[in-house]
Regions:
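Short gly/pro/ser/thr-enriched loop/turn and capping motifs at secondary-structure boundaries
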Residues: 76-78, 172-173, 194-199
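Short, flexible loop segments at boundaries between secondary-structure elements
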Residues: 141-147, 186-222
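Proline-aspartate-enriched helix->loop->beta-strand connector
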Residues: 156, 160-170
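A short, gly/pro- and small-residue-rich
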Residues: 57-66, 174-194
Length: 244
């Protein structure tokens, strides 16, 4: 049995623009407690995803069905503060890495799915060095041929991992997890570009940018093609302000 548990009272479901998000005392404890209760889906909510959920019913459904939705973005934390809910920002990449460490120490079975083939190859090499006792039962890049996905899903169900990390991008990683995880144990979590960072292909924003809540600017410099997606940030702020 897991040594770390969390009381359900430590987790309160709030709403930002109608999209559910949980205020937790400790997101790591909440995640481990969720695993101990049979597992479920973890979503890392930021302003961009919130706006996408309002426009994409399938994404909204996946977020609503998730057992744990953590406030990944500064915008979500700010929106909650306007409701009198004080929470700390909980970057999904940090929770996911912490869960990998926990998995290594507690013998959890882990599956990693997503990112480009070369990224997955480098990630496997790095994890073998950094977490030699990690039980990696399945790893697959995210550019599989359409006909390969049913077999991949079957393997996932047969292995029944304790932790499934998906780097398939929003909304695919959330909607895919909702569909495939039905009847399955373990934690299922979308991690966006985390595999690229862990593989050393990309870098996280410097800590000072995180403190000043301008990580979005660092990501935009790394990926100029994101500029259209960034337009959701002022739209999110305006929508929150309009709600009062």
């Amino acid at each position: 049995m897991d040594a770390v548990m969390t009381d359900p009272c430590d987790q309160q479901r709030c709403r930002v623009l109608g999209v559910g998000v949980d205020a937790c005392r400790d997101v790591m404890a909440s995640a481990i407690g969720l695993h101990a209760r049979g597992g479920g889906q973890i979503v890392t909510l930021n302003a961009e995803m919130t706006m996408s959920a309002l426009a994409d019913a399938s994404l909204g459904e996946a977020i609503a069905a998730a057992e744990l939705v953590i406030p990944d973005g500064a915008g979500v934390v700010w929106a909650l503060s306007r409701q009198g809910v004080r929470v700390r920002r909980s970057p999904g990449i940090e929770l996911a890495h912490g869960l990998l460490r926990y998995a290594e120490h507690h013998g959890w079975k882990v599956a990693l799915i997503g990112a480009a083939p070369e990224v997955m190859e480098r990630l496997q090499q790095r994890l073998a060095m950094e977490m030699p006792d990690l039980r990696l039962v399945l790893s697959a890049h995210g550019y599989q041929a359409p006909e390969a996905w049913p077999a991949l899903e079957a393997t996932l169900k047969a292995e029944a991992p304790d932790l499934v990390l998906l780097a398939l991008g929003v909304p695919r990683q959330e909607t895919w997890a909702l569909r495939v995880r039905q009847g399955q144990p373990g934690l299922w979590m979308g991690v966006g570009g985390s595999f690229d960072v862990w593989a050393g292909v990309k870098q996280r924003a410097p800590q000072w940018m995180s403190r000043f809540q301008v990580e979005w600017l660092y990501r935009l410099v790394q990926e100029p093609s994101r500029w259209r997606r960034m337009l959701s940030l002022p739209a999110f702020a305006w929508a929150v302000l309009r709600r009062g």
